[in-house]
Amino acid sequence: MIAGISGRVLKKSGNVLLVETKSGVVFEIVCDVQTSEEVKEGGECFLHTFLSVSQDGITLYGFSNEMKKELFLSLTKVSRLGPKTALKIISNEDAETLVAMIASQDVEGLSKLPGISKKTAERIVMELKDEFESAGIKDMRIYHESLEALVSLGYPEKQAREAVKQVYREGMKTSELIKEALKFLSHR
């Protein structure tokens, strides 16, 4: 799997980027709208990526941060919701707001997003609410920042996620949550 791509943006066409790595390999990467707007043609970028293989072909999706990628992956697990629809959802709302909408079971808010029917919004909430509620974390930004930090330190994502869930207390700052999660992980 290709987890990330670092390189120079050769060309932008809508939400599709051509990124050349230092080794000279050029990747075609489909991004959400915000990520595409953030990168400049001719500029350097790093994208968190997901390689999708389906009967329609192979597509490399790119995101400016890990939270967007994680949300995209969660959305693609929803029945009858493919990567194209997941990308469309992420392109129309910021990740923190989407996570909050799902955790608070805001079907009405989700169904207002372009291309999302009420039934699709209900399915998203039904299938993902536990994933976001189980963390018991009101501020998902702190949760994801802490998770990213632990993963970047080399902890497997599953262990990092469990540690963050176990030690989180409402009102914690990101640095406190990381510190407590590291203590938890060191005692395992």
Swiss-Prot record:
Ranges for region Domain II: 65-143
Q: Which GO terms describe its molecular function?
A: ATP binding; four-way junction DNA binding; four-way junction helicase activity
| Stored CDD domains | UBA_RuvA_C
Q: Which SMART domains match?
A: HhH1
Q: Where is this region: Domain I?
A: 1-64
In terms of InterPro entries, this protein maps to:
DNA_helicase_Holl-junc_RuvA_I, Hlx-hairpin-Hlx_DNA-bd_motif, NA-bd_OB-fold, RuvA, RuvA_2-like, RuvA_C, RuvA_C_sf
Q: Which GO terms describe its cellular component?
A: cytoplasm; Holliday junction helicase complex; Holliday junction resolvase complex
Cellular compartment(s): Cytoplasm
Alphabetized Pfam families for the sequence? HHH_5, RuvA_C, RuvA_N
Q: Which keywords has UniProt assigned to this entry?
A: Cytoplasm, DNA damage, DNA recombination, DNA repair, DNA-binding
Q: Where is this region: Flexible linker?
A: 143
Domain III: region residues: 143-186
Q: What does this protein do?
A: The RuvA-RuvB-RuvC complex processes Holliday junction (HJ) DNA during genetic recombination and DNA repair, while the RuvA-RuvB complex plays an important role in the rescue of blocked DNA replication forks via replication fork reversal (RFR). RuvA specifically binds to HJ cruciform DNA, conferring on it an open structure. The RuvB hexamer acts as an ATP-dependent pump, pulling dsDNA into and through the RuvAB complex. HJ branch migration allows RuvC to scan DNA until it finds its consensus sequence, where it cleaves and resolves the cruciform DNA.
The free-text domain note is: Has three domains with a flexible linker between the domains II and III and assumes an 'L' shape. Domain III is highly mobile and contacts RuvB.
Identification of the protein by name: Holliday junction branch migration complex subunit RuvA
What species was this sequence derived from?
Thermotoga maritima (strain ATCC 43589 / DSM 3109 / JCM 10099 / NBRC 100826 / MSB8)
